[in-house]
Amino acid sequence: MQTLDRPNAPTQQPYPEPVYPRRPTRTVAVADVLIGSQHPVVVQSMINEDTLDVDAAVAGIRRLHEAGSEIVRVTVPSMAHAKAMEAIREKLIQTYKPVPLVADVHHNGIKIALEVAKYVDKVRINPGLFVFEKPQPGRTEYTQAEFEAIRNKIRETFTPLVQTLKAQNKALRIGVNHGSLAERMLFTYGDTPEGMVESALEFAQICAEQDFHNVVLSFKASRPQVMLAAYRLAARRFDALGLNYPFHLGVTEAGDGEYGRIKSAVGIGTLLAEGIGDTIRVSLTEAPEKEIPVAYGILQALNLRKTMVEYVACPSCGRTLFNLEEVLQKVRAATQHLVGLDIAVMGCIVNGPGEMADADYGYVGKTPGVISLYRGKEEVKRVPESEGVQALIDLIKADGRWVDPPSSH
């Protein structure tokens, strides 16, 4: 017996509308790359070369940019490193092309930041270290007067950088790390997402006072649960204050290998699925170029950016009528250059046609030794399994959607 009202049938769409609309933000320009608002989620990474080695740094930046990192960050721990950025930028222009660059500045870094701002498009600071408070052994609390004194020192120290970036039309990232909160934040809020958010807010409010809004925020942690809580809280807190700055997402120190990728996908992907996040960096203990495919894979899985063929394939079961794993690899090898297509490879007709209904093309086991080719939901032809992959290629060609793969040379 039916006990619930029948819901209205939704209009069929190629992809469902997101459950969580994307968080509205300002647009922040980093050279010619736009972050936030409705612009595509930006992928970025960081070189691991010493910035003082100009040739090595230029080579590292170029490798990352060619791999798909749209913005590249470099570490700038000293004034000498800051001055080296001038030569790095010039050599990039001479030997490659301009690349949007971010300088990473940490401990008591105002002089370094003011210098390097001349040569980069964005400066990243860590609020817990930028105006460094040396921990005092035995301290049990901060008085309100002490708290305000440090806040005034931060305003006095930080404001010149804000004014410089505003005058040069450059960007700032206020990048909080869970592991480096200032001592007074730890005393006041504990080692919590609240402390992370308040740490960023202190600096963001100074930017707002100076009418400088070319600001990106990040709240990174090595544990996805902590970073998820921090970003969600930050979205509520900053938006309530009208400081709708874009967010840079990342699980810091995610590690390496499969597990590092899983941690990054869980943290970054969950927030993106909730509509939170405007630029991402996957942090792996590997060559930086290996971070880039993971980042684009996360975006592809959420249908936020399409940079490869989307393959739909069942896990195989007793009903499968051909060697699914082998055939999928053959189909992938033949079609992986056709960026933008969705291709389904399904083992049988029980779930195949329904599960692949939104794919552009389908390859489905029909009977032993015979496969069916689909264009969308329409079965086009049945061919012997031995001819299946070539028949799929011919179908794509007949539809005018085939391009030859790029030359290996």
Swiss-Prot record:
GO molecular function (one): 4-hydroxy-3-methylbut-2-en-1-yl diphosphate synthase activity (ferredoxin)
EC annotation from Swiss-Prot or TrEMBL: 1.17.7.1
Pathway: Isoprenoid biosynthesis; isopentenyl diphosphate biosynthesis via DXP pathway; isopentenyl diphosphate from 1-deoxy-D-xylulose 5-phosphate: step 5/6
InterPro entries given in the database record: Dihydropteroate_synth-like_sf, IspG_bac, IspG_bac-typ, NO2/SO3_Rdtase_4Fe4S_sf
Matches recorded under HAMAP family: IspG
Record function comment: Converts 2C-methyl-D-erythritol 2,4-cyclodiphosphate (ME-2,4cPP) into 1-hydroxy-2-methyl-2-(E)-butenyl 4-diphosphate.
Protein name: 4-hydroxy-3-methylbut-2-en-1-yl diphosphate synthase (ferredoxin)
Source organism per UniProt: Synechococcus sp. (strain JA-2-3B'a(2-13)) (Cyanobacteria bacterium Yellowstone B-Prime)
